[in-house]
């Protein structure tokens, strides 16, 4: 079991280095953290992203995996929901332990 999120879809005619559609980030905010269970034949793809933060350029190495999606689990605070889906091929962006998450304000 791996914790992954689907890579953002790009607009038609753009490659994976182009800016993704804004809808993807909105989905992450409303749908919670998604944990995917993948079948065999995973391929690792490492992509070097250049991020601009506070005027400073920072390079980040992101690991992606390509495989068959069998099902996924939606995780909310205090709730786990298993959702079945037909097996489809997707590229998934791995969430590593180095990813910082914003703290929730009470």
Curated annotation (Swiss-Prot):
GO CC terms in record: nucleus
Single biological process term from Gene Ontology: single fertilization
Q: Which residues form a coiled coil?
A: none
Q: What GO molecular function annotations does the UniProt record carry, in alphabetical order?
A: HECT domain binding
Q: In which tissues is it expressed?
A: Expressed exclusively in testis. Expressed in ejaculated spermatozoa of germ cell. Expressed in the nuclei of spermatogonia, spermatocytes, and round spermatids, except elongated spermatids (at protein level).
- What domain of life does the native source organism fall in? Eukaryota
According to the record's subunit comment, the protein's assembly and interactions are: Interacts with MAP1S. Interacts with UBE3A (via HECT domain).
Family to which the UniProt record says this protein belongs: Belongs to the VCX/VCY family.
What protein does this entry describe? Testis-specific basic protein Y 2
